[in-house]
Amino acid sequence: MALFESCTSEQKNVLKKQILKLEKGITKLNHWVREYEFASITYEIEFFKTVKPNLVSNYLYLNLLLRLLQEVPNIAFNDLTVYKKYSKEAYTFLKEENYFYNYLLNNDSCNDELYFRRLETTLNYYSPNHLFSDIKSTCSHGLLTAKIKAYEMWLIFCNNKIQTIKKQYLINQKSLDSSPLVWEAHKVDAIELVYALYFGGAVN
């Protein structure tokens, strides 16, 4: 992921190609799992709770990076407010899904059989979008798990950018403080400048 986290616009095409590869990989995985018979419920849960969400979360995360490249002009890549806005968006999402987010953070498993088995088995239509899902290749909370993982990565990226920008600002500030402006022209020139400013109304 580090290749894309410098966020230069030249990387946009490379990023799109990587997203397309992941998209094709996810499609193939869905086709494969439709007909696959898991050896046990434990393996089925592991696939839908860990394996597939890890792949989908990378896909979603790269799409967040692409969105940044598309929305933010080059001149604003080091604007603190940009990354504060995006991180706030991520925090808002995680807050809205607070119950399930804590379920994952605490490594809970009490509802795994409901959350992470095929929809065909559980019929747990957590989201209206599941009405249009392939019940053999999806579970009720797999996509939500992937989104949470993607936003966690996104928060790390945004916070790293914020810290980098702040550090660079402090370095620049120290550089200015250690290099005070020194008048190197003749004193007469300085006096003429003061008079010019005074009579021009710039100073009182």
Model regions and ranges:
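Intrinsically disordered, low-complexity acidic/Q/S/K-rich activation/interaction tracts characteristic
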Residues: M1-K174
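Basic amphipathic recognition helices
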Residues: L170-V203
